[in-house]
Amino acid sequence: MYVMFLLSILLVLGFVSISSKPSPIYGGVGLIVSGAVGCGIIMGFGGSFMGLMVFLIYLGGMLVVFGYTTAMATEEYPETWGSNVVIWGVVLLGVGMELFMVAWMVEYGGFGVGDVFGGVENWMIFESKEGGVIREDSLGVASLYNKASWFAAIAGWSLFISVLIVIEIIR
């Protein structure tokens, strides 16, 4: 419980560091840390196969992209997080919002956000003579392509547009 809570806080703080990046080098490091923490959260909830696949695919692709863009956008004196008041303001605002959300969850026990998927009997079920078992990895992939196929299409399109934007920026 507390490990997942700590990983969730690290994930949000990683995203805050990405949003307030002063230099492309720090943005890439923030994405790598956030990706690793997100995969740790997936593995903590029992999705060991899914966490490993996301870790390998995400970090494999992102390391290539950020290695290339960092090499093309190297600065002699990169701006750090402490060199600008606006960057400190964004970081402190993000940390403040995170502390507010933690206090809210401690006080009220959560946000009540969630989606209940019905009809899981058509998804990946491993059956034997004694009964059936639904694995979290298979259920997550099946729900992504069954109930949330629009999300997969939007994610693919966003990644394609992101690659085009990165190529245009560094050209």
Swiss-Prot record:
Species name? Lemur catta
Q: Which GO terms describe its molecular function?
A: NADH dehydrogenase (ubiquinone) activity
User: Can you state which reaction this protein catalyses?
Assistant: a ubiquinone + NADH + 5 H(+)(in) = a ubiquinol + NAD(+) + 4 H(+)(out)
Q: What's the gene?
A: MT-ND6
Function summary: Core subunit of the mitochondrial membrane respiratory chain NADH dehydrogenase (Complex I) which catalyzes electron transfer from NADH through the respiratory chain, using ubiquinone as an electron acceptor. Essential for the catalytic activity and assembly of complex I.
In the record, biological process GO terms are: mitochondrial electron transport, NADH to ubiquinone; mitochondrial respiratory chain complex I assembly
What name does this protein carry?
Answer: NADH-ubiquinone oxidoreductase chain 6
Xref: PANTHER family: NADH UBIQUINONE OXIDOREDUCTASE SUBUNIT ND6 (PTHR11435), NADH-UBIQUINONE OXIDOREDUCTASE CHAIN 6 (PTHR11435:SF1)
Gene3D superfamilies with a match to the protein in the record: NADH-ubiquinone/plastoquinone oxidoreductase chain 6, subunit NuoJ
- Whom does it interact with, and what assembly results? Core subunit of respiratory chain NADH dehydrogenase (Complex I) which is composed of 45 different subunits.
Q: Which domain of life does the UniProt lineage start with?
A: Eukaryota
